[in-house]
């Protein structure tokens, strides 16, 4: 796999200083803005000042939708969230996929790449698969995933931030935060912590919302996700549906406040609310600003 000549040089502590501070943003994925009643990211930014940047969820076989293309045409800040690569599988970083990735990043000009570090597909990659299972939480699973992160960074010239995936059940004895902390160090990279996903893990294991955060290298946390979740039950099993609604659970806020206050390199926070109306989403932005206060990263002037 050829290395991009723009590949970030130096160790993480050198590279992180070159990353821009993006502020408070919104996420989207293909077709989300076209859903009935869904917010328009451009309007959220222009009319309400609530979208410093756009995190674009991308499955290469689908490409960019009109909302993402319109944002990119303005030259506004973005990040690229992959939805179709298993980082621990070298075959996923094939020449065709990397070529498509480079073409889309040339359009979006993202500050970095990010995405859930889990199983996006089982077997051959196929359009619309988007399985998304969490990784098996064992030490042996770390090295292959770290190798994928390093390879993707070298091939694209962009930082790659692994995100903790959602799940109703988690296999393996390790705590999720121990796994991701060790992964970040092995890959010499930063982290994207999804606070709603983390609460799903803690709840599934019967743990306190802040369990093991004292063991996570918080100086590697670059981005946070905050999203609504809906508690539900299936045949006696308590679950949280990761619905990206407007009802953010108290434990999710607790996690976000704790991490934001202790992460000196935090550069971006996303409110995941893409399929809700602007009117429904605005209170979430106000609450996020109030709760994170001085710890909320402020976007750099263009």
Summary of predicted features, one role per range:
Residues 1-103:
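N-terminal pre-domain/capping segments
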Residues 16, 43-49, 63-80, 96-111, ...:
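Acidic (Asp/Glu)-rich catalytic clusters
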Residues 30-32, 58-62, 84-86, 117-121, ...:
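Active-site-proximal loop/turn and secondary-structure-junction residues that shape catalytic pockets
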Residues 54, 113, 194, 224, ...:
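Conserved, mostly hydrophobic/aromatic
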Residues 91-92, 131-142, 201-265:
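Gly/Pro-rich active-site loop or hairpin
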Residues 96-191:
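Active-site acidic/histidine proton-transfer and metal-coordination neighborhood
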Residues 153-236:
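Acidic/histidine-rich catalytic cores of soluble enzymes
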Residues 278-301:
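C-terminal helical cap(s) of enzyme catalytic domains, especially alpha/beta-barrels
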């Amino acid at each position: 796999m050829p290395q991009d000549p723009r590949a970030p040089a130096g160790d993480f502590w050198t590279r992180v200083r070159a990353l821009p501070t993006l502020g408070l943003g919104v996420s989207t994925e293909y077709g989300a803005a076209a859903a009935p009643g869904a917010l328009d990211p451009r309007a959220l930014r222009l009319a309400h000042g609530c979208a410093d940047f756009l995190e674009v969820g991308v499955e290469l076989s689908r490409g960019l939708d009109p909302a993402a293309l319109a944002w990119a045409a303005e030259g506004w800040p973005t990040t690229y969230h992959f939805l179709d690569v298993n980082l621990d599988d070298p075959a996923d970083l094939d020449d065709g996929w990397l070529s498509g990735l480079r073409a889309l990043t040339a359009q979006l000009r993202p500050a970095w790449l990010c995405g859930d570090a889990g199983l996006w597909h089982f077997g051959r990659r196929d359009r619309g698969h988007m399985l998304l299972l969490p990784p098996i939480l064992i030490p042996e699973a770390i090295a292959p995933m770290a190798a994928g992160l390093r390879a993707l960074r070298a091939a694209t010239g962009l930082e790659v931030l692994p995100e903790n995936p959602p799940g109703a059940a988690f296999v393996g004895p390790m705590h999720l935060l121990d796994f991701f902390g060790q992964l970040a160090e092995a890959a010499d990279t930063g982290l994207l912590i999804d606070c709603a996903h983390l609460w799903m893990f803690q709840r599934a294991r019967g743990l306190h919302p802040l369990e093991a955060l004292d063991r996570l290298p918080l100086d590697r946390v670059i981005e946070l996700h905050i999203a609504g979740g809906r508690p539900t039950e299936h045949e006696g099993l308590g679950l949280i549906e990761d619905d990206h609604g407007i009802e953010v659970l108290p434990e999710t806020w607790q996690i976000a406040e704790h991490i934001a206050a202790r992460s000196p390199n935090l550069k971006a926070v996303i409110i995941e609310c893409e399929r809700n109306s602007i009117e429904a989403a605005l209170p979430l932005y106000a609450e996020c600003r109030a709760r994170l206060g001085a710890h909320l990263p402020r976007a750099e002037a263009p």
